[in-house]
């Protein structure tokens, strides 16, 4: 993992605002199972509670996601991190950063907050063990000063969990 230049935080474009308002309306009518959006006045930053699926290692455990939308959403992926404490998972670092390809290189404008949440719940549900990534300490140490996970050049090598 290496770093690249940090994206700047700018106000949402008109397209991003329209898309997010539509997604929020759809979410409020039919939220994905296991998720609850905490309503605020900030369309650019969502807080979402995720509860582990029944029959999994994370059953009935609730964690919090923070989703920040870039100026050009949905052409650019949102930044999605777990707020402390992050679940122990082979693809979730203790600082909340998530190693999931759809949040980075495999992002598509056809994806939605709903589809991202379902992917994260699926990732949690398929885990055979609660453990941190092998390089957790090194990665977290290198992420000081609030570095965004979008500044990391991720290596997606394990799609089993």
UniProtKB/Swiss-Prot annotation:
* Keyword Transferase applies: yes
**Which Gene Ontology molecular-function terms are recorded?**
ATP binding; ubiquitin conjugating enzyme activity; ubiquitin-protein transferase activity
Question: So which domain of life are we looking at?
Answer: Eukaryota
Residues of the active site = 99
Top EC class of this enzyme: transferase
Tell me the ranges covered by the UBC core domain, including all copies.
15-161
List, alphabetically, the PROSITE patterns matched: UBC_1 (PS00183), UBC_2 (PS50127)
Q: Which CDD domains match?
A: UBCc_UBE2W
**Pathway listed for it?**
Protein modification; protein ubiquitination
Q: SMART domains recorded for this chain?
A: UBCc
Q: Which reaction does it catalyse?
A: S-ubiquitinyl-[E1 ubiquitin-activating enzyme]-L-cysteine + [E2 ubiquitin-conjugating enzyme]-L-cysteine = [E1 ubiquitin-activating enzyme]-L-cysteine + S-ubiquitinyl-[E2 ubiquitin-conjugating enzyme]-L-cysteine
Keywords (alphabetical) are:
ATP-binding, Nucleotide-binding, Transferase, Ubl conjugation pathway
Family stated for the protein in its record: Belongs to the ubiquitin-conjugating enzyme family.
Q: What functional role does this protein have? A: Accepts the ubiquitin from the E1 complex and catalyzes its covalent attachment to other proteins.
What is this protein's name?
Answer: Ubiquitin-conjugating enzyme 15
In its UniProt entry, the species of origin is given as Arabidopsis thaliana (Mouse-ear cress)
Source species taxonomy: Eukaryota, Viridiplantae, Streptophyta, Embryophyta, Tracheophyta
């Amino acid at each position: 993992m290496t770093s690249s230049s940090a994206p700047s935080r700018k106000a949402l474009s008109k397209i991003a605002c329209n898309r997010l308002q539509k997604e929020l309306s759809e979410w409020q009518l039919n939220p994905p199972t296991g998720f609850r959006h905490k309503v605020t006045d900030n369309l650019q930053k969502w807080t979402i509670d995720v509860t582990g699926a029944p029959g999994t290692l994370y059953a009935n455990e609730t964690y919090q996601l923070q989703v920040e939308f870039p100026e050009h959403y949905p052409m650019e992926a949102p930044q999605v991190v777990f707020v402390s404490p992050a679940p122990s998972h082979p693809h979730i670092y203790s600082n909340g950063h998530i190693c999931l390809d759809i949040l980075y290189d495999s992002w598509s404008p056809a994806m939605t907050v709903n589809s991202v949440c379902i992917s994260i719940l699926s990732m949690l549900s398929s885990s055979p063990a609660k453990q941190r990534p092998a390089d957790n300490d090194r990665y977290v140490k290198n992420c000081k000063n609030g570095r965004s996970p979008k500044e990391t050049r991720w290596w997606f090598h394990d799609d089993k969990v």
